[in-house]
């Protein structure tokens, strides 16, 4: 019988913590709004647009932000809002679709896309037409990112115009008596030059935030909630060798001690020497109770002949839980499975309002007959926040700054069918890449880096002989939160050294290419 996910971060229980909630209307990047607010030291989290006024009262936020989204307020299936929320006396900021929704519900007028020729996509110059607390400290003209088809043509009673642009007569509006604000652009993205200032003004000047949220608060909150949720029952944690599951392990140990059993599944898709390193770091240094399971044959047999990336993820996710079932059957009274799911995993796997980019191993690969309830203590955090959490928990840099590693392991860094030969090329080339990046002192500057077996063979010459071997791609990116990323501009001499070493030291490889694609349009991983 399937059991439901346990939502570990329920901010309605944080009675002593100020929070600003963001209502989700479907933008793939609306969680960045919550992230920006958190950067100011104010707790924030995405909530469904279906939230009721009573639920908002229970959460007791100091502010509400209505996010952007792709819908029109005139669509039959348009996302709405419980209008009683407008009567709660809580400051509201509507962004893009959020501004249009605010206008539509409060008696203004929104013109559908194309009717007035007022579409705006890309950077635009915003012109302030009135003084506003929301724009305090920003210039009269500023560059913002617009992304809208529909537009406001009449603002509701009680509001006044704050800013416009060449193609948008009402780019910002406010009703200072009710503390309602609307902006047609996106302050959460870095293309809006003064976006952080605008969000900060809303949080502090308008909502009265104190900025006293910290990772220490998060640790205390999660430990308390884990203890309340788990009680005297037992938890299994799957260790993948990555940062996320390692941080979850230390957090759970602090919360419930020996009620935690960690299962480290060696699925045969790990990096070079990873299995022994996991046991030494987490079992030895931190004293976690770890059961190591060699299930490599089970996984590799199931993956034989499979080249579709989604099928790979599903197979690995399913088998991972089945291995857990097998191991859990040997233990008594285990009710929970803990995972290192991050906020970015949840968003990319699709929410109620946003489409799926790809299924994540911690989100979309679980079978319907799973026998555990899920505990996901990190599912409101971004990767850099997980590192900060690890530091707060006293974990050393060698663990906290370990390269991110997906649950499916090297399976999604091998294009096409997985073979032992391909696995070995990725293991060895990845080890060389990590070693040379560290030698160059770039391991803190480059957010993530790894190698990929592209599955492409090409002709080469080594010695006096012709070769026909694999092409290895190097992927290295810079990022802040993993939601957007640029390819890392690695020094040529470093790339050259990496390339020379790989083709000379790794069998069956004769060509190296460098991935210079940003995210978007690409994702970080190749599959």
UniProtKB/Swiss-Prot annotation:
SUPFAM superfamilies for this protein: Adenine nucleotide alpha hydrolases-like, Class I glutamine amidotransferase-like, GMP synthetase C-terminal dimerisation domain
Protein name according to UniProt: GMP synthase [glutamine-hydrolyzing]
CDD domains from the UniProt entry: GATase1_GMP_Synthase, GMP_synthase_C
Reactions catalysed: XMP + L-glutamine + ATP + H2O = GMP + L-glutamate + AMP + diphosphate + 2 H(+)
Any one GO CC term of the record: cytosol
Subunit structure comment from the entry: Homodimer.
NCBIfam families: guaA_Cterm, guaA_Nterm, PRK00074.1
Matches recorded under InterPro entries: Class_I_gatase-like, GATASE, GMP_synth_C, GMP_synth_GATase, GMP_synthase, GMPS_ATP_PPase_dom, NAD/GMP_synthase, Rossmann-like_a/b/a_fold
Its job: Catalyzes the synthesis of GMP from XMP.
Presence of keyword Ligase: yes
Binding-site residues for ATP, renumbered to this chain: 240-246
Active site, UniProt feature: 96 (nucleophile), 186, 188
């Amino acid at each position: 019988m399937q059991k439901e996910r346990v939502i570990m971060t329920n901010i309605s229980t944080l009675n002593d913590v100020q929070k600003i909630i963001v209502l989700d209307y479907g933008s793939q990047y609306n969680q960045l709004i919550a992230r920006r607010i958190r950067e100011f030291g104010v707790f924030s989290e995405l909530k469904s647009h279906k939230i009721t006024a009573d639920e908002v009262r229970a959460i007791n936020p100091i502010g509400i932000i209505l996010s952007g989204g792709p819908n029109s307020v005139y669509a039959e299936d348009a996302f709405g809002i419980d209008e009683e929320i407008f009567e709660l006396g809580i400051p509201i900021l509507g962004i893009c679709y959020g501004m249009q929704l605010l206008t539509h519900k409060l008696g203004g007028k929104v013109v559908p896309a194309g009717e007035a020729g007022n579409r705006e996509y890309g950077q635009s110059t915003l012109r302030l037409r009135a003084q506003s607390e929301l724009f305090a400290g920003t210039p009269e003209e500023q560059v913002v990112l617009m992304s809208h088809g529909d537009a406001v043509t009449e603002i509701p009673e009680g509001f006044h115009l704050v800013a416009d642009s060449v193609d948008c007569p009402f780019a910002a509006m406010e009703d200072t008596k009710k503390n309602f604000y609307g902006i047609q652009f996106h302050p959460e993205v870095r293309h809006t030059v003064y976006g952080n200032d605008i969000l900060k003004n809303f949080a502090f000047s308008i909502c009265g935030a104190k900025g006293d949220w910290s990772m220490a608060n998060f640790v205390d909150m999660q430990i308390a909630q884990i203890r309340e949720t788990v009680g005297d029952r037992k938890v299994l944690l799957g260790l993948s060798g990555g940062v996320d599951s390692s941080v979850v392990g230390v957090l759970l140990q602090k919360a419930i001690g020996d009620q935690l059993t960690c299962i480290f599944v060696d699925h045969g898709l790990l990096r070079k020497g990873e299995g022994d390193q996991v046991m030494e770091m987490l079992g030895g240094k931190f004293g976690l109770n770890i059961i190591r399971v060699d299930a490599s044959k089970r996984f590799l047999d199931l993956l034989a002949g499979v080249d579709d990336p989604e099928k790979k993820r599903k197979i690995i996710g399913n088998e991972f839980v089945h291995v857990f079932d097998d191991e859990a059957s040997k233990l008594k009274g285990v009710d929970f499975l803990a995972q290192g799911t991050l906020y970015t995993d949840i968003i990319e796997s699709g929410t109620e309002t946003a489409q799926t980019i790809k299924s994540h191993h911690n989100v979309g690969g679980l079978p319907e007959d799973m026998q555990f309830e899920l505990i996901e203590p990190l599912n409101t955090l971004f990767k850099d926040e997980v590192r900060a959490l690890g530091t707060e928990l006293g974990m050393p840099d060698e663990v906290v700054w370990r390269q991110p590693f997906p649950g499916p392991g090297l399976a999604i860094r091998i294009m096409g069918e997985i073979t032992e030969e391909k696995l070995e090329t990725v293991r060895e080339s990845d080890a060389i890449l990590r070693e040379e990046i560290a030698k160059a002192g770039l391991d803190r500057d480059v957010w993530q880096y790894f190698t990929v077996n592209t599955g492409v063979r090409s002709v080469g010459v080594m010695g006096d002989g012709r070769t026909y071997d694999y092409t290895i791609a190097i992927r290295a990116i810079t990022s802040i939160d993993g939601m957007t990323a640029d390819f890392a501009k690695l020094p040529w001499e470093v790339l050259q050294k990496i390339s020379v070493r790989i083709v000379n030291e790794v069998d069956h490889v004769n060509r190296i290419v460098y991935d210079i694609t940003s995210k978007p349009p690409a994702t970080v991983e190749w599959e």
